[in-house]
């Protein structure tokens, strides 16, 4: 991501949030399918369950989940007030089944929830943490999850060599170009994506906000944190959906 997208502390800014609100539907590969995959993975939870969404954005994923599971409640956490306002408006029809809270993903205060958490989900957020921060996050999430709880992550992943990075960069360009044409009939969104340096695999800077980790490393960290049933459910253009459970479900 280009430098102007960050604030002075190299954090996600409200300007970045507005860009993502306007262009996120083009930039995320198979966005609609990803949401269905994540929602489907929650089907093993029966009865009333409480879900925690780390970096909920505008709440599109949460809408899919709340529609699919009428007995679920969901708390959306995000670092952007603009995102939280949008989510609260977008999900107002669910009443008190959806609540929102401003937070810092890397902080510890939110990791001591007052109510039982049956699932933690996160889309396009964990890559903002360093490797050690991801490991701590996985350990803390394992602790707060109820027995048989599940952690589901959809995120950007790093590649171990230049060949993998190049393939992911080209694939992501192709995905965004195709979505731009499919949704709008032109390549304007793709041109913005390219001009503003949103292809992380072409413009990744070690000092940038984006710190993706290899998928294999993250799967190992999940097991080391105590999770079982660690699995990968989807991959495309440097993006993946993977999950882990607090205990095995037959």
Protein language model regions, located:
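A short glycine-rich, Lys/Arg-flanked "PGG" loop and its adjoining helix->strand segment in the class I
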Residues: 135-147
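Class I SAM-dependent methyltransferase SAM/SAH-binding core
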Residues: 52, 59-108
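A short acidic, Gly/Pro-enriched loop at the edge of an enzyme's catalytic core
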Residues: 111-120
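Conserved class I S-adenosyl-L-methionine
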Residues: 1-46, 60-64
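Residues lining the SAM
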Residues: 122-126, 154
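Conserved beta-strand signature within the Rossmann-like core of class I S-adenosyl-L-methionine
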Residues: 148-155
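C-terminal alpha-helical "lid/dimerization" subdomain adjacent to the S-adenosyl-L-methionine
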Residues: 156-223
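Core SAM-dependent methyltransferase catalytic element
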Residues: 228-250
